[in-house]
Amino acid sequence: MKITPKNHEKVFAKDELLVTKTDLQGKITYANRGFMDIVEMDERVLIGAPHNIIRHPDMPKIIFKYLWSYLQNGEEIHAYVKNICADGSFYWVMANVTPSYINNKVVGYHSSRRNPTPKAMEVIKPLYEKLLQAEKSGGISASEKLMNDLLKEKGVRYDEFILSF
């Protein structure tokens, strides 16, 4: 499903939690009503679909590289993500993604998303624009260098940086 982005932001309630679960390949196995409502897709479309069905083209790939690196090491991760809806509009989230276990074996991933704070968005939006520009001109390695330089300058890991807002 190819979605054409529109410059229209959607927001969801401050106390609302958007939840999805995926299998190890990133295919959606569960989505709560809040998630389905904001993306304007129902279970027939979402269940079994790759989670990147909602990936907005403005998202720098390096963020997902960090996400998968943490998850594959069995660690939870927090990330600010701009997602796309079925109608092309977008919404921002602060996502917390954790591995799901059965008998000490990772069987999938659980993502809970909240509204990001305005303070975080003041930093994240321009940062992601710079990362995306670097990616377009020099590939993912250029955006990775930019992000790593920022983290080194601040003396923090990615997760510490994200949780500092």
What are these regions (language model features)?
Residues V107-H110, R114-F165:
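Juxtadomain coupling helices with adjacent low-complexity linkers
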